[in-house]
Design a protein with these regions (language model features):
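Nucleotide-sugar donor-binding catalytic core of glycosyltransferases
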Residues: 1-52, 59, 67-77, 81-82, ...
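Charged, glycine-enriched surface loops/patches
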Residues: 100-114, 139
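A short, histidine- and acid-enriched strand-loop-helix "catalytic/donor-clamping" loop
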Residues: 110-126
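Conserved acidic donor-binding segment of nucleotide-sugar-dependent glycosyltransferases
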Residues: 303-309, 319-323
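A charged, aromatic-enriched C-terminal amphipathic alpha-helix characteristic of glycosyltransferases
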Residues: 321-353
Length: 367
């Protein structure tokens, strides 16, 4: 089966993970990426370089201008040449409804699917960010929703088909690993949180963890965390917070006895990618509670949850003084995430199975 995966393609977690999984399943896969369209060109002067960079940043941020037109034209041309059975567009902020209509006219047998890890219908996002995607929703053959609550919302704005597609972990990157002595110095701790900052209750929760004297580490985008680590007397010791990627991300999880999982209130999350990555790493996950995440792991047996700051601190103290229980719950969570097929290859297999069943024998989509 021929599949074209389109997206920004900056991260190995998203488009690249999908691409690799589909290849593992034996399909012929091509990529279409648009982040490189916004790379600054070489200029003779520093001023020329800065003007070019500013111009491209503006077009990329506000999704206007000749570069956006070129991206859409090039996607149409690649689809015309490759003639995929499936066009899978990841976070299609840059792709317009007109483009999808053009693709459908020249390649009517191609199924066009869209997917987002962010919540494009949440009120906290700037309206301009998702305007092209939302306008194009009726032009997709199927929208894959990251969250349960988005399913009906997508239908209300014209989606033809909507199906839940949860996030995933990548077995090659998210797995138990024994840390070297040097890595233990860098990553060893009682409790870790790896993720971005949001102006929600996580600040109070993290401050309380530090206040109670637990050995805590935090990793994430510095531009997110700087706004709080420079203001909070308790969190100043962590400034500057640094991100971790690839093998270091996995080591940051494996180096902790407990890994925290907070949900994005901006995206109205009831689970997140780390819901699967933390158990896959073999570390105990202590997650913010939701009814949704409680359907995936048995509380106190395969992971644990907190609903209040007091419950969070109490459970941290319990697991740090009961090693055997902590190891047992972490191991059970690791088995659960594997048994329930939360890995990216299984996700893509489930996706293709859904498409095959939905479009029947008239489709060239095969699982």
């Amino acid at each position: 089966m021929k599949i074209l995966v389109a997206g920004d393609w900056r991260s190995e977690l998203h488009e690249a993970a999908i691409f690799g999984a589909l290849q593992q399943l034996g399909h012929q896969v091509e990529k279409f990426s648009w982040h490189q369209y916004f790379a600054p060109s070489k200029r003779e002067s520093q001023l020329g370089f800065r003007l070019d960079l500013t111009n491209k940043k503006f077009q990329n941020k506000y999704l206007v201008g000749p570069i956006l037109s070129r991206i859409n034209d090039d996607l149409v041309e690649q689809t015309k040449r490759f003639r995929p059975d499936l066009l899978f567009i990841y976070r299609g902020t840059h792709i317009t409804s007109v483009t999808l209509q053009r693709i459908k006219r020249q390649c009517p047998e191609c199924i066009i699917a869209g997917y987002n890890n962010d919540d494009p219908l949440a009120t906290g996002h700037p309206r301009w960010l998702w305007r092209h995607f939302i306008d194009a929703v009726p032009c997709y053959d199927v929208i894959f929703a990251y969250r349960q609550h988005n399913i009906e919302e997508f239908r209300q704005i014209g989606a033809k088909r909507v199906q839940l597609l949860r996030s995933w972990y990548r077995p090659a990157s998210n797995h138990p690993v024994e840390l070297s002595p040097d890595d233990r110095v860098r990553f060893g701790c009682d409790v870790v949180f790896v993720g971005h900052f949001e102006a929600d209750e996580r600040t109070d929760y993290i401050e309380e963890i530090v206040r109670q004297g637990f050995k805590f580490r935090i990793f994430g985008p510095d531009h997110d965390w700087d706004r709080i680590t420079t203001r909070s007397p308790i969190l100043q010791r962590f400034h500057p917070v640094k991100p971790v990627w690839g093998a270091d991300y996995n080591k940051a999880l494996c180096g902790a006895k407990i890994a925290l999982c907070f949900f994005s209130s901006l995206n109205r999350d009831t689970y997140t990618r780390r819901t699967f990555e933390i158990p896959a790493s073999g570390t105990l996950m202590l997650s913010q509670y939701s009814d949704d995440v409680a359907t995936m792991f048995k509380e106190g047996e395969e992971a644990d949850f907190f609903r209040t700051k007091e419950e969070l601190v109490r459970k941290i103290a319990f697991y740090l003084t009961n090693d055997s229980v902590r190891h047992r719950v972490a191991a059970a969570g690791h088995r659960r995430v594997i048994a329930d097929n939360h890995d990216v290859v299984s996700r893509m297999q489930q996706t293709l199975q859904y498409l095959s069943e939905s479009y029947g024998s008239g489709s060239r989509v095969v699982a």
